[in-house]
Amino acid sequence: MQYWGKIIGVAVALIMGGGFWGVVLGLLIGHMFDKARSRKMAWFANQRERQALFFATTFEVMGHLTKSKGRVTEADIHIASQLMDRMNLHGASRTAAQNAFRVGKSDNYPLREKMRQFRSVCFGRFDLIRMFLEIQIQAAFADGSLHPNERAVLYVIAEELGISRAQFDQFLRMMQGGAQFGGGYQQQSGGGNWQQAQRGPTLEDACNVLGVKPTDDATTIKRAYRKLMSEHHPDKLVAKGLPPEMMEMAKQKAQEIQQAYELIKQQKGFK
């Protein structure tokens, strides 16, 4: 009920014998209480809406990316299942993800419209938008290569989310570097199975993860590291609208950034 604060404020004033002005004061205090409560309820409603949209759009677009290559293969479905496993999706959550994936595979999936809606709901939360794009890039690279059609779809996504081509290309390099720290999947040479990338990470890989150059000084590298860790902090992302089911992915990304930073410090000899 929206008027509990006013009712209680007036009742307290009457009980305490505050007279006319006491009632007015109680009414004003109650009104302030009701407004604060209403804002809090609206925030929770918007938060749930944002999380639900993020979840559904993630898997819809993933399905659209997969379909863009042509026929959806068993390997593609296996990759999507692996991602659901990484998120610990089971029961109703997994079914919802699978249904969203199927929606995205439809021939007339309105990608641009969906991205505009997503951007609107995530307005002012660039770290959420960045996390969404990183998930899509990771899914596109999951088979060890980026199909030209997948790249075209990713460019559309970036454009609609307000991300420049230069920013997007940097994200690609960062995700490719992250694959060597456990953030990607590559196809084995035979059998059609999939496994995590096994080539050991290099200094260049680590620098790509942080978006810096091997020649950058320690101050520049530390600044980039702290910025990325802040943007990928799991609790902050969930507070801004990341579905709780995807917190594990945010944690894994933060671990990649940490590992890359440790390798750079070791290779360049600074603390």
Swiss-Prot record:
InterPro entries the UniProt entry points to: DjlA, DjlA_DnaK_co-chaperone, DjlA_N, DnaJ_domain, J_dom_sf, TerB-like
Topological domain ranges for the Periplasmic compartment: 1-6
MF term (GO), any: protein-folding chaperone binding
Cytoplasmic side: 32-271
Record keyword Cell inner membrane present: yes
A GO CC term assigned to this protein in UniProt: plasma membrane
Cellular compartment(s): Cell inner membrane
Organism superkingdom: Bacteria
Gene3D superfamilies associated with the record: DnaJ domain (1.10.287.110), TerB-like (1.10.3680.10)
Keyword Protease: no
Residues spanning the membrane: 7-31
Predominant localisation class: membrane
Domain J: 205-271
Keyword vocabulary terms for this entry: Cell inner membrane, Cell membrane, Chaperone, Membrane, Transmembrane, Transmembrane helix
Membrane topology: Single-pass type III membrane protein
UniProt subunit comment: Homodimer.
Protein purpose: Regulatory DnaK co-chaperone. Direct interaction between DnaK and DjlA is needed for the induction of the wcaABCDE operon, involved in the synthesis of a colanic acid polysaccharide capsule, possibly through activation of the RcsB/RcsC phosphotransfer signaling pathway. The colanic acid capsule may help the bacterium survive conditions outside the host.
PANTHER family given in the database record: CO-CHAPERONE PROTEIN DJLA
Written domain comment of the UniProt record: The transmembrane domain is a dimerization domain.
NCBIfam families named in the record: PRK09430.1 (NF006948)
Protein name: Co-chaperone protein DjlA
